[in-house]
Amino acid sequence: MLTVDNIHSYYDKSHVLEGVSLTVNPGELVTLLGRNGAGKTTTLRSILGIICPRQGQIHFNGQPLVGQKIFEIARQGLALVPENRGIFRLLTVEENLRIAVRKTSRWQMEDVYGMFPRLKERRKNAGHALSGGE
């Protein structure tokens, strides 16, 4: 379970997130929606430790995340594919996905393909062949 409780994050002196809270239960799929500048990316960056919130708490499976290093958070299974399509262009879609799956993960490729059937259809294509929405 992921819990974000009243986080406040800044870019220098600019107070970008003001009291954001959310809970994601196991098995839930959550989407952050909002206009440009609403704080969607900053919320994700705060959860992943890219930005350290100045106030509030973030917990993943009961463990506090605020103050942990980015790689420590990633080892727990939290990651972000950046807006600039940070994938390996010459690897296939499936190879890109397999990089993200840990050996100890309960997730299997069929689980991912079940959620994103279009990726299964394109699994042998090079990563650079995907459209932005894929």
Question: Which positions does each model-derived feature cover?
Answer:
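Conserved structural motif at the start of ABC-family nucleotide-binding domains
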Residues: 2-4, 17
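Short beta-strand immediately N-terminal to the Walker A/P-loop
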Residues: 30-31, 80
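The feature captures the beta-strand-to-loop junction immediately N-terminal to the Walker
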Residues: 33-35
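Helix-to-loop junction immediately C-terminal to a conserved catalytic motif
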Residues: 48
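Conserved ABC transporter NBD signature motif
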Residues: 56-64, 76, 106-114
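Short coil-to-helix segment of the ABC ATPase nucleotide-binding domain corresponding to the Q-loop/switch region
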Residues: 90-98, 123
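Conserved ABC ATPase signature
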Residues: 126-130, 134
